[in-house]
Amino acid sequence: MTREGPEAASEIVARIGRSLPPHARLHDLVDLLGDRAGGILLAVIAIPAIIPVPGVPLGVVFGTVLTVIACRMVRAGARPGLPRWLGQIHLKAPAIMLLSRRGPALLRPIEHRLRPRASLLLAGSIRPPLALVMALMGILIALPIPFGNTLPGFAVILMGLGLALGDGLAVLGALILAALATGVSVALGWAAVAGVAQLLA
């Protein structure tokens, strides 16, 4: 498998629990991943959307982080980062441990199937629209839609790894998954609103 940088994303995630300082904040996680490709950064941050932690609103926190970083990536050449107020949010220890323990098993099967191909889908002019799609996925993850995190989370992971590893077909697949995720989220949100309205009627 061709990699971006000295470590695969799964290897980076596996050592997060050991590398982050005690009482880590969001900016510590971004700093740990900041020298990696922006795609890997987004893929790693999307993992908590797929691995829920009871009682911890990871979707809201990490969905917001995804949206902010993706919006910053719209600017060509901008280094992904967080505004100061967002970077000060504390990371719960259960979230860090779950990310480092279960994240690698989630990423490895995807990484092993990716390789450089379909480079036309990775042209520099395409990157800003792709970042906007990832920002939309971050918004969907942050919204309190029942079961609405999984598809957007997988779309971001697939697109992030596709960008980092130069796999244009993975990026295309992520766009299709993002379209599906948007449709499903709209349907779930509409059903939830209709259900609440019926209860209040």
Question: What feature does the model see in each segment?
Answer:
Residues 101-152:
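Alpha-helical transmembrane segments of helical membrane proteins, especially in multi-pass transport
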Residues 45-62, 137-148, 152, 163:
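Transmembrane alpha-helix interface/packing and boundary motifs in multi-pass membrane proteins
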Residues 185-201:
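Juxtamembrane boundary at the C-terminal end of a transmembrane helix
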Residues 1-51, 175-179, 184, 191:
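Cytosolic-side membrane-entry/anchor segment at the start of a transmembrane helix
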Residues 65, 72, 152-169:
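Interfacial segments of multi-pass membrane proteins
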Residues 53-90:
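Hydrophobic alpha-helical membrane-embedded segments
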Residues 2-7, 14, 18, 91-120:
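Membrane-proximal soluble regions of multi-pass membrane proteins
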Residues 2-13, 70-84, 119-131:
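Hydrophobic alpha-helical transmembrane segments
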